Protein backbone atom coordinates (compact mmCIF):
# COMPACT_ATOMS: atom_id res chain seq x y z
CA UNK A 1 0.00 0.00 0.00
CA UNK A 2 1.50 3.35 -1.02
CA UNK A 3 1.49 6.40 1.27
CA UNK A 4 -1.18 7.91 -1.02
CA UNK A 5 -3.36 4.82 -0.63
CA UNK A 6 -2.92 4.89 3.16
CA UNK A 7 -3.98 8.54 3.37
CA UNK A 8 -6.97 7.88 1.12
CA UNK A 9 -7.98 4.97 3.37
CA UNK A 10 -7.82 7.20 6.46
CA UNK A 11 -9.85 9.89 4.67
CA UNK A 12 -12.52 7.36 3.71
CA UNK A 13 -12.68 5.66 7.11
CA UNK A 14 -12.97 8.94 9.04
CA UNK A 15 -15.08 10.65 6.34
CA UNK A 16 -12.77 13.66 6.33
CA UNK A 17 -13.33 16.84 4.34
CA UNK A 18 -10.49 18.43 2.39
CA UNK A 19 -10.24 21.20 4.98
CA UNK A 20 -9.75 18.67 7.80
CA UNK A 21 -7.16 16.80 5.75
CA UNK A 22 -5.37 20.08 5.02
CA UNK A 23 -5.19 20.92 8.71
CA UNK A 24 -3.84 17.47 9.57
CA UNK A 25 -1.15 17.44 6.86
CA UNK A 26 -0.35 21.13 7.39
CA UNK A 27 -1.03 22.14 3.78
CA UNK A 28 -3.57 24.37 2.04
CA UNK A 29 -7.08 23.13 1.27
CA UNK A 30 -6.37 23.39 -2.46
CA UNK A 31 -3.24 21.27 -2.02
CA UNK A 32 -5.21 18.61 -0.14
CA UNK A 33 -7.90 18.67 -2.83
CA UNK A 34 -5.36 18.34 -5.65
CA UNK A 35 -3.67 15.43 -3.89
CA UNK A 36 -6.98 13.69 -3.17
CA UNK A 37 -8.09 14.08 -6.79
CA UNK A 38 -4.55 13.40 -8.08
CA UNK A 39 -4.65 16.55 -10.18
CA UNK A 40 -1.42 17.17 -12.08
CA UNK A 41 -0.12 13.88 -10.68
CA UNK A 42 -0.16 15.22 -7.11
CA UNK A 43 -0.24 12.44 -4.53
CA UNK A 44 -0.09 12.22 -0.77
CA UNK A 45 3.49 11.64 0.41
CA UNK A 46 4.88 9.58 3.25
CA UNK A 47 5.21 12.83 5.22
CA UNK A 48 1.50 13.53 4.62
CA UNK A 49 0.68 10.02 5.83
CA UNK A 50 2.79 10.42 8.98
CA UNK A 51 1.20 13.81 9.71
CA UNK A 52 -2.43 12.72 9.26
CA UNK A 53 -1.81 9.49 11.18
CA UNK A 54 -0.23 11.28 14.15
CA UNK A 55 -2.89 14.02 14.13
CA UNK A 56 -5.84 11.62 14.33
CA UNK A 57 -4.20 9.05 16.62
CA UNK A 58 -3.66 11.85 19.14
CA UNK A 59 -7.34 12.80 18.89
CA UNK A 60 -8.42 9.17 19.32
CA UNK A 61 -6.15 8.77 22.36
CA UNK A 62 -7.73 11.81 23.99
CA UNK A 63 -11.16 10.25 23.42
CA UNK A 64 -9.94 6.95 24.85
CA UNK A 65 -8.58 8.77 27.91
CA UNK A 66 -12.07 10.08 28.69
CA UNK A 67 -13.06 6.57 29.69
CA UNK A 68 -10.03 6.21 31.97
CA UNK A 69 -10.80 9.53 33.69
CA UNK A 70 -14.30 8.34 34.62
CA UNK A 71 -13.13 5.05 36.14
CA UNK A 72 -13.66 5.03 39.96
Which stretches of residues belong to each language-model region?
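DNA major-groove recognition helix of helix-turn-helix/homeodomain DNA-binding modules
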Residues: 46-63
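Short, charged recognition helix plus adjacent turn
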Residues: 9, 34, 61-72
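Recognition helix of helix-turn-helix/homeodomain-like DNA-binding domains
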Residues: 27-42
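A short, Lys/Arg-rich alpha-helix, primarily the initiator
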Residues: 1-14
Amino acid sequence: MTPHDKVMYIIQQLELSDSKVARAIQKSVSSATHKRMRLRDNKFTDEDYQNIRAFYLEKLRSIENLEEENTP
